[in-house]
């Protein structure tokens, strides 16, 4: 983990207190806490966005019937508080604001642009053989050691990068190393693109404890279409994984590859409601 100074810790604690208030309260008190969060961001880190952006957020949080306020309520009510704080602080404060400032300084120093996020493949190995996937075509032998992963994230944090996407192969084949990495870098945010078949209660408990991991599950549509590409039984395994993640109140999404064969299905109300 990159070096963290006292002022940084104090600033992070301020944001955490306001986030706590938004999580614990409801209705008008929650909206008040979210307004305070916008005020705090504008006061301490306001030069990242223009005035119009802060006005937009105030308009959203002042209207209890806006779709975005309803979405915020769903997140704050349905996702575990530790994940809300971990992902919110790391993706927002560390990556979006503090990281942006550091990246701009590093850009001037080194004369190159610094990315906001980095995509890493911990392994080319996968437990599935999906039609058309490069992993099935090129083999399962390419690995990044834990030491390499740790070095990459440490060097990235020093440049202001705190957002990390992980694909593969299947990243959760390296489940233990990913959890170890997330624990070693508590101020970074890790987003995993996974087939979902290796997600279990033990993994979800660790994700809740750490607070800085969110998975996106690959899905091609309903069972028949999905399993045609990914293999028989995979759809039901994904449904079980989603049930487990919901039980533990994880933040997660889906990664959908749309084609001429499934685009109508994956954009249908029925499919989106299932998610």
Residue positions per predicted region:
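Conserved alpha-helical substructure of the radical SAM core
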Residues: 35-191, 197-202
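Radical SAM/AdoMet-radical enzyme domain recognition
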Residues: 146-166, 172-275
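Radical SAM enzyme [4Fe-4S]-AdoMet core and its adjacent flexible, acidic
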Residues: 1-55, 59-63, 227-275
């Amino acid at each position: 983990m990159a070096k963290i100074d006292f002022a940084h810790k104090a600033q992070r604690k301020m944001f955490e207190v306001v986030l706590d208030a938004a999580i614990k309260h409801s209705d008008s008190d929650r909206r008040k806490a979210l307004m305070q969060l916008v005020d705090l961001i504008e006061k301490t880190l306001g030069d990242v966005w223009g005035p119009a952006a802060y006005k937009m957020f105030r308009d959203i949080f002042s209207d209890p019937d806006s779709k975005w306020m309803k979405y915020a309520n769903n997140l704050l009510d349905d996702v575990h508080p530790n994940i809300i704080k971990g992902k919110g602080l790391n993706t927002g404060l560390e990556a979006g604001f503090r990281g942006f400032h550091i990246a701009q300084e590093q850009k001037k120093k080194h004369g190159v642009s610094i990315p906001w996020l980095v995509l890493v493949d911990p392994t080319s190995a996968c437990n599935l053989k999906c039609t058309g996937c490069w992993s099935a075509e090129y083999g399962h032998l390419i690995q990044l050691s834990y030491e390499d992963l740790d070095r990459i994230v440490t060097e990235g944090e020093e440049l202001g990068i705190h957002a990390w996407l992980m694909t593969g192969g299947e990243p959760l084949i390296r489940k233990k190393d990913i959890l170890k990495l997330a624990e070693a870098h508590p101020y970074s945010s890790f987003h995993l693109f996974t087939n979902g078949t290796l997600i279990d209660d033990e993994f979800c408990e660790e994700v809740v404890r750490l607070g800085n991991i969110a998975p996106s599950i690959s899905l091609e549509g309903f069972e028949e279409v999905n399993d045609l590409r990914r293999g028989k039984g995979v759809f039901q395994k994904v449904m079980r994984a989603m049930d487990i993640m919901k039980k533990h109140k994880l933040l997660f999404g889906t990664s959908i590859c749309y084609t001429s064969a499934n685009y109508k299905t994956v954009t249908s109300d029925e499919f989106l409601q299932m998610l």
